[in-house]
Amino acid sequence: NQDTYFHLSRIIGLDNVWSSPVNFNNFDHHGTMMNIFYPWLTLYPAFLFYKMMGNLVLSYNIYYFFITFLTMVVSYFSMKQIKNNRYISLLFSIIYTFSAYRAIDIFHRASLGEAVALTFLPLILMGCYEIYIRDYQKWYWLSIGMTLVVYTHLLSVAMVSVFIGGTLFLSFYFWDQKIARLLSLLKATVLTFFLSAGFLIPFIQQSRAQELKVPLGKELSGMAPSDMLTHILNNNYNNYTIGLFLFLGLIGAFIFIKKLTADDLFIFFLGVFVLFCSTNLFPWQLFNHTPVKSLQFVWRLNGFSSLFIAYTMSIVIYYIFSTKNNSWKIMVFTFLALILHLSGVSNSIHANKDSLTLIAPEDAVAIAENYNHTDYANKESIYHPDMINNDQYLLGNQEINPTTHFMSNKLTIELDNSNNKNTVLTTPIYRYKGQVASINGKLVQTKLSKFGTTELTIP
């Protein structure tokens, strides 16, 4: 998937992130301000792996292993806080971490940002559980979870916020100590904003400075239930579903529904409703002219349905088999989960074997450096693609071929102005608020060209 190239380019572009929001050594050397518009903090370990090992492909894979391990730890910790039962916590950790949709994000879509955001959803679930139901003084867990998602994937932040708002509306009537719990939710919101300000403020500042090319919304449409059931039963990871293992857990939860408390039932039916919303039975057409269109793909909801169903499934499995030899039974379910996980991944690889692209370690850095990504450029650049794609430089109205040198923090352009007068140099370099340029060591002002790129006057 081209998202692999995108994230590899992001990784190598973090080598100067503490000194500059722009790196000229990635995204085809056009000076994309990616680190302002796409959160990077939780990606930074991947860059550290790369610096230690010097192998971009290996570092990328180790980072996914690290995130998978972290997902297991966060899931176990979150469920342990909710249920105070290590067996339920272990079951939830395994079921959620090796859920089909998370595997699809990693292996089929290469959607690293969303996959990492899934790591922190259990923490947000636990934070909401404390505020809504139990010890509202532990509201800080919600802030920690939300902040980590903010520094990972902005669309996931929007989706989580909608879920928090929806569950607040549905559950508020049943709360005790309503004022105290609302204040705790407000505290969590305020703290999240302050903790996230390092990303949010520059993001808002640059977004307001000019009209940008951003990922477009798409016509929203769910999957036909018959198709969804077929893909689930086939454990097909080429299509975006919750997978066979969670589906079996969903059926089991309906059969043993009396094992669930009122709180568990709320989470379970929330998962069922979200799964229903991912089908074409839900009237998504009504939202195609609203901000909801930014969701782009309805199947993104599977991350949330996987969370809620995995929560319920772990409880049901435990209470069905809560006799002796719990460790042995957990091992059996772990084995089953891993078998279905591996079969789904291997089937997906086999089905796509003719279209797979293998990135050799020795080629990875060059591929990442030269990958051209046009999101977050000035919107006007959409109408002049040749300027970017062909690296065109114009001195006045004449195309020239200057010598260029790229460093992480700096792009140097060498040319002679033979016009003997001030002439405008138009470059294929993106322009953002705060850009610094100099000619022969003297600071000069830059402007936004009619092509949506940087221009400056050469004496």
Where are these regions (language model features)?
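Active-site lumenal/periplasmic loops and adjacent helix-entry segments of GT-C-fold
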Residues: 1-82, 86-122, 127, 155
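Membrane-interface helix-loop junctions at the exits of transmembrane helices
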Residues: 14-22, 88-109, 195-214, 266-296, ...
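Membrane-interface transmembrane helices that cradle and orient dolichyl/undecaprenyl
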Residues: 124-138
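Membrane-interface alpha helices of multi-pass inner-membrane proteins
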Residues: 127, 139-154, 188-194
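Perimembrane helix-loop-helix junctions
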Residues: 160-191
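Membrane-interface helix-loop-helix junctions at transmembrane boundaries of multi-pass membrane enzymes
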Residues: 175-185, 251-278
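Periplasmic/ER-lumenal interhelical loops and adjacent helix-loop junctions
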Residues: 182-185, 189-255, 369-372
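Active-site-proximal, structured, solvent-exposed surfaces of multi-pass membrane proteins
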Residues: 383-459
